[in-house]
Amino acid sequence: MSQPFKEAMFYTPIENKGVVCNLCRHRCKILEGRLGTCGVRYNKGGKLLTLVYEKIIAAHVDPIEKKPLFHVCPGSSSFSVATVGCNFHCDFCQNADISQVKIKASPESEPSPEQIPGEQLSVEQVVEIAEQHHCKSIAYTYTEPTIFYEYAYEAGKLAHRHNILNVFVTNGYLTAEALKEIKPYLDAANVDLKGFNADFYRKKIGAKLEEVLDSLKLMKSLGIWIEVTTLIVPGWNDKEDDLRKVAHFIYAELGEDTPWHISRFFPHYKMMDVEPTPVHIIRKAREIGLETGLRYVYTGNLPGDEGEHTYCYHCNKILIRRYGYTILENHIKEGKCEFCGAVIDGIGLN
């Protein structure tokens, strides 16, 4: 049986029963009877409700490498969950069937719990399932964890009491106040930095690049372990100059120890007419990252590529040999390179 909708966190009442949602950096002004840009936060009579609390559309046990998080408990499993909805509207979204779900709502037609796609999965159940499958972490992923923040926040608190880590796979559009509130329970995040082109962010995503950069810097200052992913879309964010700007930002603002995952685009959603990213561009981007001084630069969606492996930044030997999400060798012992003793950056590198 569906539960009543839960009151949302982070909003401010305004005139005429309107509200301003302060969860993400859009800071939507939501009139009575309307939804935010994420499509899952509804203003009912001046009270902001989350429509997706404990309503899960996807739940799987994944290798942590799939997030991708290569420096968080390598080889472990992560119980991964999502609700419908997203505060971005990327033309190239690979999960558009669940992220871009349209929920009907108006002042005359209030949404009902039965309308919301997904199955009821309580906070207690998500932690219990993670334990049953010996998962070292719970990943809030697939769509955008920001828009099911209340669920992630409550599950995250409980997970920590059971010695389970919490990780976000996020577009990095949380407000500073939302990030600071969840910081005690958020151990790591893979953040999509979709390029360094403000025009690309505005036209193809509907967001502001500068806001994402501010979030990344704040996460770093809060002590959250960060890995960055850039999906390279031909003709949009594949220029060498833009890639150098991404690499330099990571190096200068997040640190040389921040992993950068460079991912190959395949046609999807509203960009079916765009060709897959040429492999040489992915490899060139990795080269740029290494030249900039980043220690760990990875190629994504290229199974078998040498860029899948983790190399020691000191002796250059392969520390973790991968094929796709599978670990074939691991030469990190007690957080150090087995060959030269260099300290390798990350969480749970045993």
What are these regions (language model features)?
Residues 1-21, 25-83, 96-100, 308, ...:
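N-terminal [4Fe-4S]-dependent radical SAM core
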Residues 1-32, 235-350:
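Auxiliary Fe-S-binding modules of radical SAM enzymes
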Residues 22, 84, 88-91, 157, ...:
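Core alpha-helical elements of the protein kinase catalytic domain
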Residues 34, 86, 197:
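A generic "binding-loop/recognition-motif" signal
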Residues 46-153:
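Extended interfacial segments that mediate partner engagement and assembly in macromolecular machines
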Residues 90-93, 168, 228, 337:
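Hydrophobic packing within well-folded, soluble alpha/beta domains
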Residues 118-280:
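Conserved AdoMet/S-adenosylmethionine-binding subsite of the radical SAM
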